[in-house]
């Protein structure tokens, strides 16, 4: 898909972070922009930002929607058609949440919340929008589906189980949709970034009341530590530009990178993830050490060229604590166990 002007884009999770960056980028290309989010205050602020970015107010539609509720998501799709005269030509599903902790400490609520937003909302959107898009645009004009996944789709850790499982499923869904949509003149792209400058570090604040029973240690101090990491993530508009290039060039997997060397090291590491699970633990540890050294060397070279990834500073110990640990009252958990250990 290369011709964006005058067409319609819908971005789930478009009120902040990566989603808002995508809305800005494609709105700047002349698209009519619809964004969906669960928070009205965030939507109101996003509309102001989009207008300030140069997108005409008449080309902006902000919809408060629970993306995990199929009836509500269908209502959202209906509103887009009623407002702009058709379904989106470009569907970008970006809404996501995360919660970190030992997977053996996880509760049903931890899985239901993370999988519900990160996977089920994507399924909902595909099943609601794609039939409409095919009927309206197949063999007539360009259309495309995209989803924001994560590097976590390729490499799970003991503290990211629900999130990594959801993102791995999303990736495979998009591979399937790319194959399925080819006969209709369309395709799919899955964006797999690392750290993004976004509000996902605040996600726990907006966790539904009926899914609050977590097995992880979560409080304002742990969230502050997480926010410190996301504060130095890739700029959402820059990430949106990377996604646009991937869509224009029909890339199925989009891996944002800072330098070619970092990208090459990243790809080799991903290939090793699959290969390593067939090896002994000692062999895996040896390869992991080599990969860390290679990544460190690539990062040092990037720093010399002025293209290094930004560093971050942890908050002070007085007002923060490590995230990714289990609740203290779970007596089957090793109390010293930390994220990905």
Named regions from a protein language model:
Residues 2-34:
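Canonical Rossmann dinucleotide-binding motif of NAD(H)/NADP(H)-dependent dehydrogenases/reductases
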Residues 29, 155, 176-186:
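Active-site-adjacent segment of SDR/Rossmann-fold oxidoreductases
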Residues 40-41, 64-75, 108:
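The beta1-alpha1 cofactor-binding region of Rossmann-like NAD(H)/NADP(H)-dependent oxidoreductases
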Residues 102-103, 107-115:
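Substrate-binding pocket helix/loop in short-chain dehydrogenase/reductase
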Residues 126, 166:
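Active-site helix of classical SDR
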Residues 150:
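Residue(s) in the substrate-gating loop at a strand-loop-helix junction
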Residues 179-259:
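SDR active-site lid
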